[in-house]
Amino acid sequence: MHTQVLFEHPLNEKMRTWLRIEFLIQQLSINLPIADHAGALHFFRNISDLLDVFERGEVRTELLKELERQQRKLQAWVEVPGVDQDRIEALRQQLKSAGSVLISAPRIGQQLREDRLIALVRQRLSIPGGCCSFDLPTLHIWLHLQQAQRDAQIESWLASLNPLTQALTLVLDLIRNSAPFRKQTSLNGFYQDNGDDADLLRLMLTLDSQLYPQISGHKSRFAIRFMPLDSENGLVPERLDFELACC
């Protein structure tokens, strides 16, 4: 059985921001519990990147709009015969609940911005080697605390992101499942089509091909060019089958 590789590409700025936030939040949990300097720097660098993303746009506002939009889309399915009404209602309640929690939550990332340790580490991250023990004695002593003490602090930091994480996960799941994968064929490594107001492209390639897609475009139209991983000796077949979902 061929191994399939999934690629996702945003077709607008809000989706680009959401995918970056999702990626960074996932990265925060990868190396837990934090037991050494390398794990700590990975964690704090992702916290810093996440706060930078928060400062660039109205994340909460866009998410609340999307939660409402998804509720309207579900409402349109209520009158369709054969639809699982219980499932529709359960999803609507989840969307409503996530919106209520998000709108009543403090400013996204505020607890992280106000934390002294996070602020100190953020100041040094842009300096090559700037997180040595003599630069950041606060981090050095923090890493020598009892593991349970560090774990509790990290748990508190991550919990402050829960309103965002829950809403974002729900929205992205609905968007990703809004369109099925369909078989498509590229000619000489190129494929283009209309976006039909899609937010996200999802593309499946077999690993055997050792190709990757370069995607450009927006919600109205997009183009995909397939490139060989080995730029010197790799070949792109004249016809390449792949699976594509426009979500």
UniProtKB/Swiss-Prot annotation:
Q: Does the keyword Transport apply?
A: no
Q: GO cellular-component terms in the record?
A: cell division site; cytoplasm
**Location relative to the cell:** Cytoplasm
SUPFAM superfamilies to which the protein is assigned, alphabetical: YacF-like
What domain of life does the UniProt record list for this protein's source? Bacteria
- Function per UniProt: Cell division factor that enhances FtsZ-ring assembly. Directly interacts with FtsZ and promotes bundling of FtsZ protofilaments, with a reduction in FtsZ GTPase activity.
To which protein family does this belong?
Belongs to the ZapD family.
Could you tell me what this protein is called?
Cell division protein ZapD
* Gene expressing this chain: zapD
